[in-house]
Amino acid sequence: MITLLSTGSNAHGQLGNNTLDDSHIFQPCSFINHPPNSLPPGTSALLSVVSGANHTLVLLELVDQLGLKKTELWGCGDGRAGQLGKIYREESFAGSSTAKFRKIELFLEENGLPGYSYRLISASWETSYAVLSCSGKGDVVISMGSDEFGDLGIGGFARIEKSEKDFHVVKFDHLSTPSSIHNALRVESITSGQRHTIVHLQISESANIPPLLVGWGTSRHGQLGQLSSLSNSKPPPFISLPRIIALEDVVSSALGIHHSLFLHASGQMSALGSNRKGQLQLSPSKSVRAIGCTWNGSYAVVESNEGWRIYSSGSNSHGQLGLKANPLNADIPNSGIVHFPEILDSKSTSIEIACGSEHILVLSRDNIKEDRFVQQVSKFWGWGWNEHGNLGTGNTDDTLLPLKIWSNESGFISYLKGVDELTGIWAGAGTSWICCLHNDDT
């Protein structure tokens, strides 16, 4: 049985576990009008979990009785800014619980988007985003919630509109691309930090136009690049319409509060924004396979002859850099290699990283050959800030080095009970999430 578990900060019910109390252990999430400890019937995959300050969105894939797939958007937590849609906010004001996941109804067809479905999601502090796709048409990016720092990406118009909308459509037709090809736009990725968002746009190959990297939101620290032709001019506090970021061959992005990190197809990285905490001082120059950002830190997963290595730099106020020599001083820039108690073999092991506000989760899967059989040994690690119990270890003590929280190794005593396998990990603002295959009898 597929189950979503959560732990950590929960003042507004953002863990979706039917309480408003912080949780120090991973507990099953609840979906309204469905049996406890289970996802909605027909769920075949949990595609994504994103969270802001106090709200959470999950993207589910479901299969109906005819075998047809569809996606649904569910949310919980604080929706007062409209970050979970107009109906969710109205129902919450009327007394509906924010501590259970509710299906997010946005009436796409009534708003001029018939045939579209949810494909990607993202969230900043009090704003949510979804990428909609429809066969034969270009992708559409929608936003909902707070617009204090241009978060909605619509030019600040939300503050002067008198009528409330279910959502807003982020436009890209003001960019230097022919208007005739916007039906061929495909969104490869959408990533949000605390107050800024970056989208990777792929234009139809027949148009012979290279991919575009665009962003909006807070920009004071240069996290969205140089926005003026004058090199000595200061970036504006924020921009409220998507602007092109002059970087090429970007395959993924990761965003903190005041900085942005980019992974290029070459396996190299680049970065924009503040380096006040040393968050731009990552040392690997090649073979980077994945990146991540905490609020004031940067992380790079590197494939080396010695195995997987995770390089970290930036704030280390809660041990979130995972360094063996561990000066807990947020004001002294730090960088180094995360110290795991065992080698992660890059030849037989895959690795996944999730960065929260100031804590990190890692899931490794090792294919071990025994005689004629191959056994997959999975290990789930966590370290860093743990004030709200967001590492799920049953306490609120910060963890300075990677701690093995769960493994399917024989004889391992786990913090997670009754879990057969982990299929996904996510981290937020003092929150952590895991999707797992769960024993039915627990």
Please annotate each region the language model reported.
Residues 250, 286-288:
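Short, well-ordered alpha-helix to beta-strand connector turns
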